[in-house]
Regions:
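Extended hydrophobic secondary-structure segments that form protein cores and membrane-embedded regions
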Residues: 2-4, 56-62, 89-94, 244-246
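Glycine- and acidic
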Residues: 3, 22-28, 57-61, 126-130, ...
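Radical SAM enzyme [4Fe-4S]-AdoMet core and its adjacent flexible, acidic
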Residues: 129-139, 146-263, 267, 273-277, ...
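Canonical Radical SAM [4Fe-4S] cluster-binding loop centered on the CxxxCxxC motif
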Residues: 2-37
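Radical SAM/AdoMet-radical enzyme domain recognition
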Residues: 39, 43-58, 67-205
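Short cysteine clusters
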Residues: 10, 14-17, 262, 268, ...
């Protein structure tokens, strides 16, 4: 289960973000803050439901670091309280702009894996990833990454592939090699625009092909050329040095193994998400009213 302690709240306003407008689903809860009561209930029940000796907690946003460090320290205390002999691991996704020495010390001391959202070199990243004032965010993200490296925190990158950066696959890939990022996840962005009465503008899957493709969407041809170009470069000299999730997952599928990524699995629905108020959905990309499964308090 991917847990969202701040819901859609974020200090950035990326043009392509599919999650910012989820705040419109919870207008009656303007703060979008997970309570200590819900945190404890979730940790207890989540650990108790596991059948394996290792339990992984995944913290996602919005921007996860908009909750104070004390929240995550509390979470770790509760994990220890309810561990029942299991090994607990944590990973957290962040845009990197709010990272400090204190945050990085906490992550290193407790062996958290940190995922950083960064869309390649500055020109590519700043095309769509801006703050709420419309200012670019690349410099602050790189400051955060350098802090992670300084403190020896294990980290990887999630990079959105859009209509702009998809045109420069080798520049894009070489950037991650230059900043010594050895684990990279590519996330192609494709959205349709449909206006809703509650203020949302992105179409759900239930709406099919209604609406026009958003301008930032990567085209099928762009995505294919992007992957093929990077693969040809990667396979020549970087196998075993740099790990690209989609290549590893494709190989795993080919070998009859578990791909490790839900989009390549035989069945959808193994990567659920819980919102700040306990609402549960089958997927981070299915947070729409019609796909709500229930609430941790009621179902």
């Amino acid at each position: 289960i991917m847990t969202k302690p701040v819901g859609a709240v974020c200090n950035l306003a990326c043009d392509y973000c599919y999650y910012l407008e989820k705040a419109n689903l919870y207008k009656e809860n303007p703060k979008h803050v997970m309570s200590d009561e819900l945190l404890e209930k979730f940790i207890d029940e989540y650990i108790n439901s596991q059948t394996m000796p290792q339990v992984l907690f995944t913290w996602h946003g919005g921007e996860t670091l908009m909750r104070p460090l004390s929240f995550y320290k509390k979470a770790m205390e509760l994990q220890k309280k309810y561990a029942r002999g299991r090994t607990i691991d944590n990973c957290i996704q962040t845009n990197g702009t709010l990272l400090t020495d204190e945050w990085c010390e906490f992550f290193r001391e407790n062996n958290w894996l940190v995922g950083v959202s960064i869309d390649g070199p500055q020109e590519f990243h700043d095309e769509y990833r801006k703050n709420k004032m419309g200012k670019p965010s690349f410099v602050k993200v790189m400051q955060g990454i350098n802090l992670l490296k300084k403190h020896g925190v294990e980290w990887n990158a999630m990079a959105v592939v859009n209509d702009f950066n998809a045109e420069y696959p080798l520049d894009f890939y070489n950037f991650f090699k230059e900043i010594d990022c050895h684990y990279i996840q590519f996330a192609p962005i494709v959205e349709r625009i449909v206006s809703h009465q509650d203020g949302r503008h992105l179409a759900s899957l239930a709406e099919g092909k209604e609406g026009a493709l958003a301008d930032f969407s990567v085209s099928p041809e762009q995505w294919g050329n992007f992957l093929c170009t990077i693969f040809d470069e990667w396979v020549k000299e970087d196998v075993g040095k740099f790990f690209i999730q989609i290549f590893d997952s494709t190989l795993a599928n080919w070998m009859g193994e578990q791909p490790g990524v839900c989009t390549m699995a035989k069945h959808c629905g193994h990567a659920g998400v819980m919102e700040f108020n306990g609402d549960v959905y089958s997927c981070d990309h299915f947070v729409f009213p019609e796909y709500k499964l229930g609430n941790i308090y009621r179902q």
